[in-house]
């Protein structure tokens, strides 16, 4: 005899029943997570598909967009029932000071007592996200984990202290211009085994990249590249503006991969263009990834003002790194301070219009591994590299590939190192190894973090497509 009671079909609780208990304003504010319908497209086993790298690297459901959205909904329900404000975290200096006592208490004295609200479990799930935005581009209902991840991290760290690692990453764009004044000293420190061990064990960072050490002021002067300003741009005639381009610098290619920067200048100049470079301002992407949202909004406001003054001349603005450049189109547009940010083109979007055609037979084959954010969010733009190469008699193919496992600073965090390596071995590793075989086309990568990961994992430096194109105009 069984004592089990049969459940009525219409008596089984549904997800919608608990979702209705969440405050309507909260529901609408976190719509990208609330609208996850559980289709499971993110449970993708294909290693050569971009979504979702953390799921493929761990095979843990909490490390998938569906898992994170489900955890967030449950967390929001618990916060609603507890009367907590999840729409706005305390901000500003006063907010930081006011919450300091409670953050100290929660972090050191009563941390385990609050485990029932899922905060720590959700934090662990969010920490495993690469913020590659593949879900934002490929999920059928456009669940964007990086968006609600950043908001959660801001709220979480209004209750708990941040690790030093977060401040180091968030301040990178602001500190690197100063550090670049002493490249030899910086590189010596970052190469020292004791310093590396200290960074690993105490800060939680590994394999810090080294500065290029190029004297950019001298290089720009030698190439006759001016600093872009409204005055300099307005001084150009209408015809001169048609042959002018302004490069928007990002911290990574500017100081850590300067050869790509210089290659762009040379390519533009040799194809008859006048090149100017915008004054450097932090882009803010690392701040957004770590949940420093007030600081990100300030950075977006400053950068947007600069870009608007430069774009008023009608001269195209171009950014080299896909992940950093697409921030202007995506994260900036979602905050009031950057909602009217002008378009900054990816290099291939500008080159397909501006690069002169060379009448020559096919003189080489190449393969491009595109950045995850770029190929999942702007696939049409990514495909433009092929006609750009055709213009100069080169054949470019884009093999299907997954994620490289670096994703900005994700792969440089010690807690993510093993997952980062596992992701690389699934897709990029075999493709890179195959490219080293005789008669194989040269492999290229347009993402700075992707090139950094290949160098770290396989000991190879992949060239940027710009560097290949420059050879055709040497």
Question: Model-found features: residue ranges?
Answer:
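Iron-sulfur cluster-binding electron-transfer modules in prokaryotic oxidoreductases
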Residues: 17, 30, 146-474
């Amino acid at each position: 005899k069984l004592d089990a009671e049969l459940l009525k079909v219409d008596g089984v609780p549904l997800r919608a029943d608990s979702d209705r208990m969440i405050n309507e304003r909260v529901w609408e504010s976190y719509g990208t997570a609330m609208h996850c319908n559980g289709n499971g497209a993110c449970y993708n086993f294909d290693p050569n598909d971009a979504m979702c790298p953390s799921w493929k690297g761990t095979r843990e459901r909490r490390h998938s967009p569906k898992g994170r959205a489900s955890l967030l909904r449950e967390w929001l329900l618990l916060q609603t029932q507890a009367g907590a404000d999840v729409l706005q975290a305390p901000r500003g200096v006063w907010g930081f000071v006011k919450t300091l006592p409670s953050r100290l208490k929660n972090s050191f004295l009563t941390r385990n007592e609050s485990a029932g609200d899922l905060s720590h479990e959700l934090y662990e799930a969010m920490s495993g996200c690469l913020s590659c935005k593949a879900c934002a581009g490929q999920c059928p209902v456009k669940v964007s984990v990086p968006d609600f991840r950043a908001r959660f991290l801001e709220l979480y760290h209004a209750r708990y202290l941040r690790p030093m690692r977060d401040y180091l990453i968030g301040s990178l764009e602001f500190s690197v211009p100063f550090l670049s004044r002493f490249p030899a000293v910086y590189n010596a420190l970052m190469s020292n085994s004791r310093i590396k061990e200290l960074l690993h064990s105490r800060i939680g960072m590994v394999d810090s990249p080294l500065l290029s050490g190029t004297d950019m002021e001298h290089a720009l002067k030698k190439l006759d590249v001016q600093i872009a300003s409204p005055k300099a741009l307005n001084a150009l005639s209408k015809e001169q503006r048609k042959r002018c381009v302004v490069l928007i610098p990002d911290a990574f290619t500017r100081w850590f991969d300067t050869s790509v920067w210089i290659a762009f200048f040379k390519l533009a100049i040799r194809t008859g263009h006048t090149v100017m470079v915008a004054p450097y301002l932090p882009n803010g992407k690392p701040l957004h990834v770590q949940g420093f949202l007030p600081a990100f909004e300030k950075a977006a406001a400053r950068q947007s003002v600069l870009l608007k003054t430069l774009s008023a001349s009608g001269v195209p603005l171009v950014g080299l790194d896909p992940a950093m450049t697409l921030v202007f189109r995506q994260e900036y547009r979602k905050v009031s301070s950057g909602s009217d940010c002008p378009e900054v083109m990816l290099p291939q979007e500008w080159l397909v219009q501006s690069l002169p055609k060379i009448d020559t037979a096919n003189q080489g084959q190449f393969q491009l591994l595109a950045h995850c954010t770029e190929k999942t969010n702007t696939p049409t733009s990514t495909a433009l590299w092929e006609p750009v190469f055709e213009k100069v008699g080169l054949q470019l193919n884009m093999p299907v590939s997954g994620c490289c496992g670096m994703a900005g600073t994700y792969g440089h965090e010690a807690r993510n190192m093993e997952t980062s390596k596992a992701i690389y071995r699934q897709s990029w590793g075999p493709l890179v190894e195959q490219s080293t075989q005789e008669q194989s086309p040269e492999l290229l990568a347009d993402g700075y973090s992707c090139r950094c990961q290949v160098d770290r994992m396989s000991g190879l430096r992949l060239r940027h497509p710009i560097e290949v194109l420059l050879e055709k105009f040497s």
